[in-house]
Each structure stands twice: as C-alpha cells, then as structure tokens.
Amino acid sequence: MEGQSLRADLHLHSRWSDGSLPIPALLELAKRLGLGCVAITDHDTLAGQPQAAAAAQDLGIHLIVGLEISAFDPDTGRKVHILGYGIRDARRVEDTLAPYRQDR
C-alpha cells in the first residue's frame, strides 16, 4: 500500500442518533465522496451496525464498528463524548447503554 492513500471518516451519525440520513443513504453519500473507510458512531447505540455492515459490503466500503458514548464529567459538570471503535460484543454494549438512552 505504499504510495496509496485511503480517505476515511471515523465519526459519522445516522438517524439512529442525531444524524439526518438513514444508514444506506449515509453510506451511499460516503461512496460518492470517495471514502473507502467509515465508522458510524451513533450516540449510545450499535443498533444500526448490522444494516451498516450489509450496506458497506454492497458498496465496497470498509466499515469499522463504532459508537459515541455520552458521559458526564462530575469534576467540571460538563457532558463529554467518548468514541469507541472495534466493538465485538454488541449485545453487551447495548445492554449496558440501554438505561442511558432512556434517560435522555
């Protein structure tokens, strides 16, 4: 791969959180923009990842499983976001984050 470049966006949101596009349309846009690798990092959910995996495969885009976790810094009183990538146990993550989604 020497001398080659890969265009990527590793912080995308779909309608599963605060994005404006459904996953298929989001990935079609990524393809039109020349992106070869994306991570859909919806807030506090991996629910769209199976659909994303299928659409990415159909479009020839490399998908990194990701999400954006909403958190609170008690020292500063600020809401913060933590990006996570390469998640393998989606069910466990979904179960852990379910109460936080309900509190929004």
Predicted regions and their residues:
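Conserved phosphoryl-transfer catalytic core
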Residues: 102-104
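Active-site gating loops and adjacent loop-to-helix segments of metal-dependent hydrolytic enzymes
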Residues: 73-99
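An N-terminally biased module of ancient metal coordination in phosphate/nucleic-acid-related enzymes
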Residues: 1-77
